[in-house]
Each structure stands twice: as structure tokens, then as C-alpha cells.
From Swiss-Prot:
Listed GO CC annotations: bub1-bub3 complex; kinetochore; mitotic checkpoint complex; nucleoplasm
PROSITE patterns in alphabetical order: WD_REPEATS_2 (PS50082), WD_REPEATS_REGION (PS50294)
A biological process from GO: meiotic cell cycle
Localization (cell): Nucleus; Chromosome, Centromere, Kinetochore
Pfam families to which the protein is assigned, alphabetical: WD40 (PF00400)
GO molecular function list: ubiquitin binding
Keywords noted in UniProt: Acetylation, ADP-ribosylation, Cell cycle, Cell division, Centromere, Chromosome, Chromosome partition, Isopeptide bond, Kinetochore, Meiosis, Mitosis, Nucleus, Phosphoprotein, Repeat, Ubl conjugation, WD repeat
Protein name as catalogued: Mitotic checkpoint protein BUB3
Annotated positions of the Phosphoserine modification: S211
Species of origin: Bos taurus
Family: Belongs to the WD repeat BUB3 family.
Crosslinked residue numbers (Glycyl lysine isopeptide (Lys-Gly) (interchain with G-Cter in ubiquitin)): K216
Main function: Has a dual function in spindle-assembly checkpoint signaling and in promoting the establishment of correct kinetochore-microtubule (K-MT) attachments. Promotes the formation of stable end-on bipolar attachments. Necessary for kinetochore localization of BUB1. Regulates chromosome segregation during oocyte meiosis. The BUB1/BUB3 complex plays a role in the inhibition of anaphase-promoting complex or cyclosome (APC/C) when spindle-assembly checkpoint is activated and inhibits the ubiquitin ligase activity of APC/C by phosphorylating its activator CDC20.
């Protein structure tokens, strides 16, 4: 099943995997949140679980603040900070509904959370304490940090662009260019735009600069669709992760496939083998050498028998991730 460039992590979560995130400066450590109410820290090269801590409900997202501190939130409405060296935890604060997204913004040194309570909250990680609550038009489904910009995707196909240095007003209000519900948004490492995916096998490449000549460059494409018995099956695109160096990106869908795309030449660079079940989350390491792939059933067909959830660690090459020079 797995080749020499890929292996499966031992001691995976016991229920669905919600998020995988690499440590900011090394591909050695991977943080994993799960519906089994745990957050796990893995030593990837050693293929061992270093540490595990619990919430009182499913954990929907997690993020590193720095190499020794993990933040996480989920269905128990609680935002936790966990010291990965001392195994001490701190309840930082709460939302009024489940916390869907947890991200760190290094340029402004704030943690950002997005919730189904229709707010985004900023947190000062040094104290740690709440540094502001900002209303969103609908439930927050996904968010991504781009320099000092924050891109928020909500229910109702809305996209909001905020300036994390001045949250007094929304910089841009947009509507998704895709017809169906937004599943994931990730910002380009070059800070020029973002990629948005929907539940209907489509991805949009968008640019932040509102000028007409830049907006002309935006486009969308179909993906994660399979012909079965001459019928096209269309799958949600659940996960996006950017390669920090090349500005190419990987997508993962409920079809069990991972694709890597070159947004500049509008080409697919590669497709990996089919994984046992839906791709729930993806993360490139900071140096772009490693991709963590969460293969985890997302209950698209309700509670049927399904393959066990797993995290695959894949070494990726420049041939798979670098734009082809024209």
C-alpha cells in the first residue's frame, strides 16, 4: 500500500482526524486533533506518539504557537494552550459555540480562532488572554492567515478579508466564486491571494488586490471527480495545503485522492495513489519536503463500515511540487 517514500504513523487517533499541522521550524513534529477528544504530538522520523492531551469533546482544530506550545479548540467551546515540554495546560478562553478553526499569525503574534458562534477571536499568546472579538456574518467554517491579513470563509458562501493590525472594519467582503458551500481556504505563501475549495469538487484561485487587472487572473477548476459506470461522482474538496517555497498546493478530497497543483501554469503536477478513505486534512512541512495526509472517513454516507483512520507521511520531491518552467 505504501511505498518507500511513504509510511503510516503508529498509534493513530481512535476516531476521525480533524487536523494535522507540522511544527513551524521542523518536519520532526506533527500535531493532530481528533474527534476522539484528543490532541496528539508525533515524532515523525521516530514514528512514535510523544504526548497526548484531552478536551471534553471532539477537537476540530489545532495549531502550534511555537515549537513547544500547542493550541486547540472544538466542540467543548474551550480554547486550550498546552505546554508540550512540561505537559501543563492552560484554559485560555471560550467561544459560545464550537471552535472550528485555530491558527497562529506570526507577523502580528496573535492566535486566531473562528467559531460557529459567528465570531473570530484574537488571543495574545504571551499572557495568554483574549485580545478582541469580531462578529462575522455567519458561522465560521475556515480561515487562513496571510501576512497580517486574515481570510475568513463562513456559511452562506461569504469570504471576508480582515487586517489583523486594524480589526475596526472589514477590508473586503466577497462572495465565493463557487456555487456551493465553502470547505477550506488557504492563503498563498507569497501573500497575493488564496485558494478556496467547495463541497462540489471545485477549487477557486483568488487574488487579494481588488484592481480589475489583477482580478482578471482569478479562475476556478473542477477536481476530485471520478467517472464510475459512466456516471460522474463529485466529491467535496476537504483540504488544501501550500508548499511554502514553490507556492504550489495540494488538495485532498472525499474521493481519497491527493493532487498537487501548479496555480501559475494552471496544471496538475501529480496525483498520488488512492488512500483508504476521505482526505480530511493535509499539511506540508515548512521546508516542503514532507506532506502529512489524514485519511479519515468524514461520515459522508452516514455511519457505515469504513476503513480505519490513518495518517500517512510522504516524502515529496521537487518534481512533484515545483512549477514547470514554461
Amino acid at each position: 500500500m505504501t511505498g518507500s517514500n511513504e509510511f503510516k504513523l503508529n498509534q493513530p487517533p481512535e476516531d476521525g482526524i480533524s487536523s494535522v499541522k507540522f511544527s513551524p521550524n521542523t518536519s520532526q513534529f506533527l500535531l493532530v486533533s481528533s474527534w476522539d477528544t484528543s490532541v496528539r504530538l508525533y515524532d515523525v522520523p521516530a514514528n512514535s506518539m510523544r504526548l497526548k492531551y484531552q478536551h471534553t469533546g471532539a477537537v476540530l482544530d489545532c495549531a502550534f504557537y511555537d515549537p513547544t506550545h500547542a493550541w486547540s479548540g472544538g466542540l467543548d467551546h474551550q480554547l486550550k494552550m498546552h505546554d508540550l515540554n512540561t505537559d501543563q495546560e492552560n484554559l485560555v478562553g471560550t467561544h459560545d459555540a464550537p471552535i472550528r478553526c485555530v491558527e497562529y499569525c506570526p507577523e502580528v503574534n496573535v492566535m486566531v480562532t473562528g467559531s460557529w458562534d459567528q465570531t473570530v477571536k484574537l488571543w495574545d499568546p504571551r499572557t495568554p488572554c483574549n485580545a478582541g472579538t469580531f462578529s462575522q456574518p455567519e458561522k465560521v467554517y475556515t480561515l487562513s492567515v496571510s501576512g497580517d491579513r486574515l481570510i475568513v470563509g463562513t456559511a452562506g458562501r461569504r469570504v471576508l478579508v480582515w487586517d489583523l493590525r486594524n480589526m475596526g472594519y472589514v477590508q473586503q467582503r466577497r462572495e465565493s466564486s463557487l456555487k456551493y458551500q465553502t470547505r477550506c481556504i488557504r492563503a498563498f505563501p507569497n501573500k497575493q491571494g488564496y485558494v478556496l475549495s467547495s463541497i462540489e469538487g471545485r477549487v477557486a484561485v483568488e487574488y487579494l488586490d481588488p484592481s480589475p487587472e489583477v482580478q482578471k487572473k482569478k479562475y476556478a477548476f473542477k477536481c476530485h471527480r471520478l467517472k464510475e459506470n459512466n456516471i460522474e461522482q463529485i466529491y467535496p474538496v476537504n483540504a488544501i495545503s501550500f508548499h511554502n517555497i514553490h507556492n504550489t498546493f495540494a488538495t485532498g478530497g472525499s474521493d481519497g485522492f491527493v493532487n498537487i497543483w501548479d496555480p501559475f501554469n494552471k496544471k496538475r503536477l501529480c496525483q498520488f495513489h488512492r488512500y483508504p478513505t476521505s482526505i480530511a486534512s493535509l499539511a506540508f512541512s515548512n521546508d516542503g519536503t514532507t506532506l502529512a495526509i489524514a485519511s479519515s472517513y468524514m461520515y459522508e454516507m452516514d455511519d457505515t463500515e469504513h476503513p480505519e483512520d490513518g495518517i500517512f507521511i510522504r516524502q515529496v520531491t521537487d518534481a512533484e511540487t515545483k512549477p514547470k518552467s514554461t
